Amino acid sequence: MIQAETSAADSAVFAGNRAQGAVRFDVRAVDGVTRRGQLHESGSLRVRFPSPEQQGLSAVLVNTAGGIAGGDRFGVDIAVGESARLTLTTAAAEKIYRSHGPAAQLDIALQVAEGGHLAWLPQETILFDQARVERRIDIDLAAGASLLLCESVIFGRSAMGETMRSGRFTDRWRLRIGGKLVFAETVRLDGDIGALLGRPAVAKGGVAIGTALIAPGDAALVARLREDADGFGAEVGITAWNGIAMARFCAQDAAKLRADMMAVLRRAAGRALPRLWLG
């Protein structure tokens, strides 16, 4: 465990420097075309819609603060209406900087109505040494909705010679389909994260991890996603249960992780990934 002592003056400085940001919007299908509904933005979080409103809508989240530090609070709340289709990514990888104070808070709420589809495809989250972050992802799908979701986390910037030795990473996921909880997971890494990642039962020395979740998902989808297995550079496990499919990734570097995740996501999506992933 990591303990940090701060004075009242230090706490006041931390509070004054904390960033906040929130994005809340919905999309809806109108005559077979997905259109934006209500939109709320605040603080340093923004959303842009770079493509024309065709059959499906694309959106890009932008953090104008340039990164996330201790005590920052960010929230995203997205609702996809009946028969609407939305693909969302981020403008760049998100960086979580070191903190000697409170953890950053990230809250993500995603709702998809009957016949709707959401592809939640943010780029990587990079944790610097001594970063402290707590993330919550809550997903609520109607019984006839579909989802393609990925998240990846890089511990340190190995290409820059930087490693993550200590910090805190808490990641809480909850997925409900038709009001029923079908997936619940909480990951907690606290203290000497470098040593934890070195354990064979944790990451076996890997510094880049990822998850792709597909709903609905079954054995046939798993077989299709495994077709690229011979070319994987990371350790990849793919399975299905409870009507969903999931792929787990663990790699020694971010480049291998991204390459393998892109291969799986392309097969799952049946189409090209957002152009920002290709840059």
Curated annotation (Swiss-Prot):
A GO CC annotation given for this chain: cytoplasm
InterPro entries tied to this protein: UreD
Family membership: Belongs to the UreD family.
Subcellular location: Cytoplasm
Assembly with partners or alone: UreD, UreF and UreG form a complex that acts as a GTP-hydrolysis-dependent molecular chaperone, activating the urease apoprotein by helping to assemble the nickel containing metallocenter of UreC. The UreE protein probably delivers the nickel.
Gene from which this protein is expressed: ureD
Function: Required for maturation of urease via the functional incorporation of the urease nickel metallocenter.
Keywords: Chaperone, Cytoplasm, Nickel insertion
Coiled-coil region(s): none
Full protein name: Urease accessory protein UreD
Entry annotated with the keyword Cytoplasm: yes
A single MF term (Gene Ontology): nickel cation binding
Pfam families: UreD
